[in-house]
Amino acid sequence: MARNEIRPLVKLRSTAGTGYTYITRKNRRNDPDRITLRKYDPVVRRHVDFREER
């Protein structure tokens, strides 16, 4: 029960507009705001920013 409250699953959607997503867990205590990670988007074949989607 406590596991889902502290570290929920979040979707990271590509800012390149391809619709590609990653799914990861996030620690709400360390990152209360929306997270942005730079990851690989295979559709455009380059690294782009992925933002948390709610």
From Swiss-Prot:
One of its GO terms (biological process) is translation. Signal peptide: none annotated. One of its GO terms (cellular component) is cytosolic large ribosomal subunit. Keywords: Ribonucleoprotein, Ribosomal protein. GO terms for molecular function: structural constituent of ribosome. Pfam families: Ribosomal_L33. Transmembrane segments: none annotated. It comes from Mycolicibacterium vanbaalenii (strain DSM 7251 / JCM 13017 / BCRC 16820 / KCTC 9966 / NRRL B-24157 / PYR-1) (Mycobacterium vanbaalenii). This is Large ribosomal subunit protein bL33B. Belongs to the bacterial ribosomal protein bL33 family. The lineage of its organism: Bacteria, Bacillati, Actinomycetota, Actinomycetes, Mycobacteriales. InterPro entries: Ribosomal_bL33, Ribosomal_bL33_CS, Ribosomal_bL33_sf, Ribosomal_zn-bd.
